[in-house]
Amino acid sequence: TTVRCKMPNGTEATCNVTVKPLATSLKLNASEIVLYIGQSFDINSSVPKGTAAYYRLYSSSNSKIAAVTRGGGVVKGVATGKTTVTCTLNNGKKAICDVYVVPKAKKISNVPLIGQSKLPTGCETCSATMLLNFYGYKISETTFADKYLVKKPFGYSNGSYTGPDPNCAFVGTPYSSNSYGAYAPIMVKCMNKYLSDKSYKAVEISGKSLEYLSGKYVAQGQPIMVWATINMSPSFKTTTWRVNYTDENAKYKLGSYYTWTAGEHCLLLTGYDKDYYYFNDPWTNARTRYSKSLVNTR
């Protein structure tokens, strides 16, 4: 409908009014965020199409850790810690976002360093072993490779190369420089095979930025395995093979074709600051750093 206001002198103004059903739900653009002290983030909220809300109020469970503008949803990190921001509609519907406020720099200094000299293509195994050693588990990279790493051969059959989905098994053997590697799902599975009677469990976290992972985990003293490239150099596609082995983590079907990305490399992320990420690198057998801008391209 249209509302009109007319002054005695004839001046007129109009306002178009649309009446919609009251929103029955509410969604924020993030369920959790990581902020540095002093950093801000706008938590936008939305309601289902065709509905409306008269107002939306934002609140923080601990404004000494992260403050939020009451009517706007802009969150600002104040001090390290965790808090929860809640958005409430006029009908009582709510949505929440967990907020982690972290220091601008963190380095975990006591992470054991293991080079891959015994396992030429075993960067994933060495990184997993470093992580296990950090949590106090006494296991060598060769023992992990021999007893816990799922390995499937790479070969040639019926006119094409054959091998496993690298999400489901190591392609070849880490003892050979002519082998390939493995991705996060199978490494998590292998680590949890070792940890089956232990208090810790390995968890795969995909689709998150290194900035998020640094704030959520490294800032809390937890190093993490990440996949990038050797020396952070550009990668390129190489060998293609027909997939002949999968498991519950498969991203490729049996009989389909997979093309390996050359230069794939697994490292242990141990720190960050304004400009750099810090790693335990099994390839160089060194604690090294790479610029954030470079790492984010790999």
Language-model segment annotations:
Residues 1-104:
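Extracytoplasmic soluble-region selector
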